[in-house]
């Protein structure tokens, strides 16, 4: 990978933050956008502009081709068996909510159990909690090991006949551990259990093959993989998508309806895509897939892990950094900073780093159950991506050298 060449594709990297060159290390929250993705979005607004699936004129047909071409591109990106298994959404959160609401209402019964775990992002667990309040389903938790990982052994320990759904992230957004999804899927399907995967943090970094994983549903967002905001996709095995009824209704999802309330829905996936879709986002997402595949996600992942290991080596030498996920093979490093025997408030550390032009995440990272496991109210998270460099890691380490309570708090006064 030629990082210097890659960085030239990202115009935002020329800007400053706090009058310092931008060091963007918050890629777990969202990623920066390369020029080819920006161009794809601008091209839609400049030269296409029409709606999809609604016009009988040339420009509309061109939009149809681009929109449905993006569906085929997404099918290839995930190695789905059928293009009809790809439903466009506003992102991971919508996709996971759709699955939780449809499955709970249409397939589950009172007393059925959904297995989750305490490291989950809110978008992975809250939909099941809320949908279950009406249906009488309940959530149980896969115990995490001492590092905060899901293991097959711990998963087996909590399996009962009442478990009907397992809903987990393939990669934790806080700790970066990769769950043994393929092994869990095999066990699930031996027992007739649905497996729902939050792919928000795995899709940007790992080669995803949903047929090999054998999950039933898989959701991801474009904005975490160099694509536009407000768009993503839900993969669902065709047998489930064909069986499930949508929860939203409107234009394009129906074939016909009449005054007697008779309704005929369109086939999968259109029955799940009511209303005008984020067309420019879908086209931009396909451009992001082209961009990442041209570089190779195996190269991207290796680069991220190298940056993390470089950070860990430097952090150990400092002696004031507490790392919570040292052994996770990802580009996520979650840490706190000590000043003597006192842990500095994570948000204060992040605000202090901002004065150096460094962007990291702080707090609970939308995983509100995990602080109890980690025994800390919050953490800082640096998340590396394809355009980050060792020089940027050096800048982060140099700033953390002088991160004391006094220095972190003094920026507010």
Locate predicted features.
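Pyridoxal 5′-phosphate
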Residues: 1-413
């Amino acid at each position: 990978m030629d990082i210097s060449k890659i960085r030239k594709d990202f115009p935002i990297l020329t800007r400053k933050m706090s009058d310092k060159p931008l060091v963007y290390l918050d890629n777990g929250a969202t990623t920066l956008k390369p020029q080819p993705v920006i161009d794809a979005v601008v091209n839609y607004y400049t030269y296409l502009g029409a709606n999809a699936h609604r016009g009988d004129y040339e420009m509309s047909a061109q939009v149809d081709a681009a929109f449905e071409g993006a569906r085929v591109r997404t099918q290839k990106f995930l190695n789905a068996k059928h293009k009809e298994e790809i439903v466009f959404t506003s992102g991971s959160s919508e996709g996971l909510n759709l699955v939780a609401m449809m499955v709970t209402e249409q397939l589950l019964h009172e007393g059925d159990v959904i297995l989750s775990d305490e490291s989950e992002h809110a978008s992975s667990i809250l939909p099941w909690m809320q949908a279950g309040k009406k249906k009488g389903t309940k959530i149980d938790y896969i115990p995490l090991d001492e590092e905060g990982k899901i293991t097959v052994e711990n998963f087996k320990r909590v399996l009962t006949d009442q478990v009907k759904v397992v809903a987990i992230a393939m990669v934790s957004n806080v700790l970066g551990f990769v769950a043994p999804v393929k092994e869990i899927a095999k066990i699930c399907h031996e027992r007739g259990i649905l497996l729902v995967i939050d792919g928000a943090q795995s899709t940007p970094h790992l080669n995803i093959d949903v047929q090999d994983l054998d999950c039933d549903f898989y959701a991801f967002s474009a904005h975490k993989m160099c694509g536009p905001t407000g768009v993503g996709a839900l993969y669902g095995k065709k047998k489930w998508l064909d069986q499930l009824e949508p929860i939203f209704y409107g234009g394009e999802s129906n074939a016909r309806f009449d005054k007697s309330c008779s309704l005929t829905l369109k086939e999968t996936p259109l029955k799940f895509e009511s209303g005008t879709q984020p067309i420019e986002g879908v086209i931009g997402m396909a451009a992001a897939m082209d961009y990442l595949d041209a570089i190779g996600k195996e190269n991207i992942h290796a680069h991220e892990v190298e940056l993390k290991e470089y950070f860990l080596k430097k952090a150990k030498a400092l002696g004031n950094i507490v790392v919570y996920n040292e052994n996770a093979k990802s580009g996520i490093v979650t840490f706190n900073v000590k000043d003597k025997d006192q842990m500095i408030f994570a948000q204060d550390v992040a605000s202090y780093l901002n004065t150096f032009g460094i962007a990291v995440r702080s707090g609970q990272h939308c995983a509100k159950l995990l602080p109890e496991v980690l025994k800390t109210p919050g953490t800082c998270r640096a998340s590396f991506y394809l355009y980050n460099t060792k020089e940027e890691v050096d800048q982060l380490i140099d700033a953390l050298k002088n991160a004391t309570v006094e220095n972190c708090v003094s920026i507010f006064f």
